[in-house]
A protein has these predicted regions:
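Helix-to-loop junction immediately C-terminal to a conserved catalytic motif
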Residues: 76
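Conserved ABC ATPase "signature" region
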Residues: 112, 116, 123-141
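Conserved ABC ATPase signature
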Residues: 145-152
């Protein structure tokens, strides 16, 4: 059975119905460093395959340097691939590992800035922003500048900006790094709610401790995705 066929058969259950929100096939990426004649090539991805259906929580696990973040950047269009295909359906939200925040702006100003970039009406920005504050529990910091925030609150804001447009598909790179226990539990309750309404999440990490929370898990090994 091919890898693509394997992952399709593994998608039965919650997933496997309707149109996939994400399909990636044969994704390859090689980084090249140095100058001729000593130019070196390092193949990071050698044919990665992924498929996410509506209403799924999928994990992507690999060691540091295995290419997880490279694959994520390719999936969201932030990095060109050398080979392979990527097809997306619906709105996409992306929470990078390194927060994309502005030190001198407040939390409220971030939501206003990103909401307008998403093309959201002001009333929708306000409603979604307030829901994010309530869900993640950091409304008390709405008027604070990023430079005043702890690492954990920055992580909440980073995640909240990805949640703002209520995307059908949410791609998260090490999303709960820096979360305390309460926020960690809030995150998984949020994940459950989104899955129950047909939305999907792809979560990448270097380890998974709560495997039962995922519908499926891929291991990224030698540049290839291996379904568990």
């Amino acid at each position: 059975m091919t890898s693509v066929a394997h992952e399709a058969s593994a998608s039965t259950g919650r997933g496997g119905e309707g149109t996939p929100l994400l399909t990636a096939g044969g994704v390859a990426k090689t980084y090249r460093t140095g100058w001729w004649p000593r130019r070196r090539a390092k193949a990071v991805l050698r044919g990665a395959n992924l498929r996410l259906w509506p209403g799924e929580v999928v994990g992507l696990v690999g060691e540091n340097g295995s290419g997880k973040s490279t694959l994520m950047k390719i999936l969201v269009g932030a990095l060109d691939r050398d080979a392979g295909t990527v097809a997306l359906a619906g709105r996409l939200g992306y929470c990078p590992q390194e927060p994309v925040l502005y030190e001198r702006l407040t939390c409220d100003e971030h939501f206003e800035l990103f909401g307008r970039a998403y093309g959201m009406p002001d009333v929708d920005i306000d409603r979604s922003r307030d829901a994010v504050y309530d869900t993640l529990g950091f409304a008390d910091w709405r008027g604070a500048r990023v430079e005043e925030l702890s690492g954990g609150t920055r992580a909440k804001l980073n995640l909240g900006l990805a949640l703002l447009p209520d995307p059908e598909l949410l791609l998260l790179d090490e999303p709960y790094a820096g979360f305390d226990w309460d926020t960690y539990q809030r995150f998984w309750e949020l994940t459950r709610q989104r899955r129950d309404t047909g939305r999907s999440l792809l979560i990448i990490s270097h380890f998974i401790t709560d495997a039962e929370r995922f519908d499926r898990v891929y291991d990224l090994v030698d540049g290839r995705t291996v379904p568990r």
